[in-house]
C-alpha cells in the first residue's frame, strides 16, 4: 500500500438542467479502506457514484483512479480498469440462473475471438474453465450454492441482492461501489450482508465505497465517512467524528446515533 490515494475526486460538479446534483465535491479513497458516503435523500450520493463509474459525466472537476483520469471514460472501460458497482434496485438478468448471471459478468475478461467462442475452440474453452472457476469460488464465498441453478427472478429480495454482489465480484474489482446494498432487507438479512461486505474487504482485499441509510450498521463497518447535503460535502472523517459533527447532526443524523 505505497499509494495513499486509490481514487481521487476533485471539485466534481454535476447538474441536470437547473438542478445542481453535485457542487464542487472533493474526497479521496485510500487503498484497502471502507469509505461510507452518507446524507439525506437527494443529497447527491448516487449521482457521485454514477460519476465515478462512468454512468454520468461531470460538468467539471476530475476523477482519478490508480493514476488514470476516468472523468469522461465510458462505464464499460471503467469496469475493465477495476471498478465494479451494485445498484439500489437490483439490475440482474431475471430470466437467467444465479450461475449464468455471474458468468455474464465475466465478459470483460474474455480474450478469445468471436469464432473461437462460437465453436468453443482452443482459447475459448480454456477461458471458459477459468471463468467458471472464478464464479464457483464466489458462489461458495457468498454461500449461495443452494440457488446456483435457480432463476434469479424467482428469488426473494435478500438473495437477489446477494447475487448482485456476486456479479460485481465476478468482475474481480479492486474498487467496489455499493449503492444501498441493504435496502429493503429485514434485520437478519442486513446482518448477513454486512458480514459479506466485511469479508469482501478483509478476505479479498477489496477497497469499498458504500452508500447506506442504516446508520447503526454503517457506523460499525465504515472506517471513514463523507457526508453530502444538497450536493455539497459538509463533513469528512472517522465515524466517531461524524457522529458528533454538529452540521451532520443538523442535516441528517438528528439524535438517531
Where are these regions (language model features)?
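Glycine-rich phosphate-binding loops of nucleotide-dependent enzymes
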Residues: 2-257
Amino acid at each position: 500500500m505505497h499509494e495513499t490515494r486509490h481514487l481521487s475526486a476533485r471539485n466534481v460538479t454535476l447538474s441536470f438542467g437547473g438542478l445542481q446534483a453535485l457542487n464542487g465535491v472533493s474526497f479521496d479513497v485510500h487503498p484497502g479502506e471502507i469509505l461510507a458516503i452518507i446524507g439525506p435523500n437527494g443529497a447527491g450520493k448516487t449521482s457521485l457514484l454514477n460519476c465515478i463509474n462512468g454512468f454520468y459525466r461531470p460538468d467539471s472537476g476530475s476523477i482519478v483512479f490508480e493514476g488514470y483520469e476516468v472523468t469522461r471514460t465510458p462505464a464499460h472501460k471503467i469496469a475493465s480498469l477495476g471498478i465494479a458497482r451494485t445498484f439500489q434496485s437490483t439490475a440482474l438478468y431475471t430470466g437467467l440462473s444465479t450461475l449464468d448471471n455471474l458468468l455474464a459478468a465475466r465478459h470483460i475478461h474474455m480474450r478469445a475471438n468471436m469464432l473461437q467462442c462460437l465453436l468453443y475452440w482452443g482459447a475459448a474453452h480454456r477461458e471458459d474453465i477459468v471463468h467458471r472457476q472464478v464464479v464457483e469460488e464466489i458462489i461458495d464465498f457468498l454461500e449461495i450454492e443452494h440457488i446456483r441453478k435457480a432463476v434469479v427472478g424467482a428469488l426473494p429480495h435478500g438473495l437477489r441482492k446477494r447475487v448482485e454482489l456476486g456479479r460485481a465480484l465476478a468482475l474481480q474489482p479492486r474498487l467496489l461501489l455499493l449503492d444501498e446494498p441493504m435496502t429493503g432487507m429485514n434485520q437478519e438479512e442486513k446482518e448477513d450482508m454486512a458480514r459479506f461486505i466485511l469479508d469482501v474487504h478483509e478476505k479479498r482485499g477489496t477497497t469499498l465505497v458504500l452508500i447506506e441509510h442504516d446508520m447503526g450498521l454503517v457506523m460499525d463497518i465504515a472506517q471513514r465517512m463523507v457526508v453530502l447535503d444538497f450536493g455539497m460535502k459538509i463533513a469528512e472523517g472517522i465515524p466517531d467524528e461524524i457522529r458528533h459533527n454538529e452540521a451532520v447532526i443538523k442535516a441528517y443524523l438528528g439524535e438517531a446515533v
